[in-house]
Amino acid sequence: MKRITKLLASHSLKSLMAKKNKRSQQKNKCLKPEKDPSTVKRLLEDPPRKKRYLQPLENPPTESYGDDEKMETEEEGEKYLGKNLPASAFIIVAAERHDSDSYSETELEKKICGSVVVAKMNDDKMVSTDTKKKYFQRILSDDDKIVLLQGMVDFQNDKGTISYDDMTGFIDTVKNIISFQANSRQFTTKIRRLKDKFVQKRNKGVDENSLANVEIYEI
């Protein structure tokens, strides 16, 4: 009998303790996390670590791309062709530099050299053409006009044909007695212009008594 009473008392005590713990847990759920005994215990055992924020990196100094590009272009131009290069050559080299990433170093060197050479040849050709035009436009003096017209008369008397029919033979006849050099096309153009100019002056009555105009008129 005593044993049964003891078991019942023990069972009642356990039931009371279980109910008490259950009430305590429900009460703790209503508390804020920092007031919850279980949360406080966990924080004491494993305190939170302070968060570290990465500092932003300073902006790296910007480089002047245009100045570097210009310096590299000038160095490459001097390296491959030396000095005294035309300005257009450096312009072409600068344009080619924008596609340098897609070429190997050897291919880029060949491409730059080719562009500079072509630009230099074009500039030289333009200068040479302008020089020839200016030279031939200013060489025909009054003495050359007289010699040229007299040579046409002599050639017709000696050969029995006019200079237009045998321009090559006429040039061979007068090339050593005039002060300029020209091909058959230039000779033909000069003779035609000389004729037109003389006819215009004669129609206007411009100084027909001068020595050169008299000799030209007589020829």
UniProtKB/Swiss-Prot annotation:
Skewed-composition ranges (Acidic residues): 65-77
Keywords, in A-Z order: Transcription, Transcription regulation
Ranges annotated as biased composition (Basic residues): 17-30
Pfam families: GeBP-like_DBD
Start-end of Basic and acidic residues biased regions: 31-48
Region annotation (Disordered) ranges: 9-77
Any GO BP: regulation of DNA-templated transcription
Family membership: Belongs to the GeBP family.
Record's protein name: Probable transcription factor At1g55950
Classification of source organism: Eukaryota, Viridiplantae, Streptophyta, Embryophyta, Tracheophyta
